[in-house]
């Protein structure tokens, strides 16, 4: 079962605190609404454009890249622009959510240097090419992002197991998507 942004909620507490007899229900978040698509495309455009602007000015940023869409080719982070095959862009620098991600804030500092200093931005930007602190930020973010993904996976697994136990489901028909990942046919 794929639980992409699955929602787990407890029914039966009628707005009060947990009583211990709540029932778990699981549903998937519906995606693909026109507004979701507009926002996603606007973010891709902004992050790609700003990443290109950093590169044009010789200012390092924190980029996400993916060399190919072949199975097993992962997204990587680095300080130099590189294509992101999954998004179909020449470069992609997270920059649009500085309140959610420190990486975006760092990139915005670099973008502000470009806006204020133009051709001399590389001299004025907070982080210079091959800056050890910038590499440290990338490394720290990679570790935190990986830990977050593992934690999210654990939460989804926990609530799925709770649901299966409450429903007394002991067998499922499923399709193997790839090594160790299956999707339930009728859950």
Predicted regions and their residues:
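Electropositive polyanion-binding surfaces
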Residues: 1-187
């Amino acid at each position: 079962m794929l639980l992409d942004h699955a929602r787990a909620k407890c029914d039966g507490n009628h707005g009060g605190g947990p009583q211990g007899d709540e029932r778990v229900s699981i549903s998937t978040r519906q995606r693909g609404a026109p507004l979701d698509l507009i926002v996603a495309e606007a973010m891709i455009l902004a992050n790609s454009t700003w990443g290109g602007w950093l590169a044009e000015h010789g200012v390092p940023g924190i980029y996400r890249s993916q060399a190919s869409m072949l199975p097993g080719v992962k997204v990587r982070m680095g300080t130099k622009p590189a294509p992101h095959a999954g998004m179909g862009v020449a470069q992609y620098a997270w920059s649009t959510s500085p309140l959610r991600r420190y990486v975006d804030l760092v990139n915005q500092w670099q973008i502000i240097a470009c806006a204020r200093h133009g051709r001399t931005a590389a001299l004025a930007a907070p982080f210079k090419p091959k800056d050890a602190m910038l590499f440290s930020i990338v490394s720290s973010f990679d570790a935190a992002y990986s830990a977050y993904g593992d934690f999210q996976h654990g939460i989804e697994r926990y609530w799925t197991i709770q649901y299966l136990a409450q429903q007394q489901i002991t067998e499922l028909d499923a399709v193997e998507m790839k090594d160790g990942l299956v999707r339930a046919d009728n859950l």
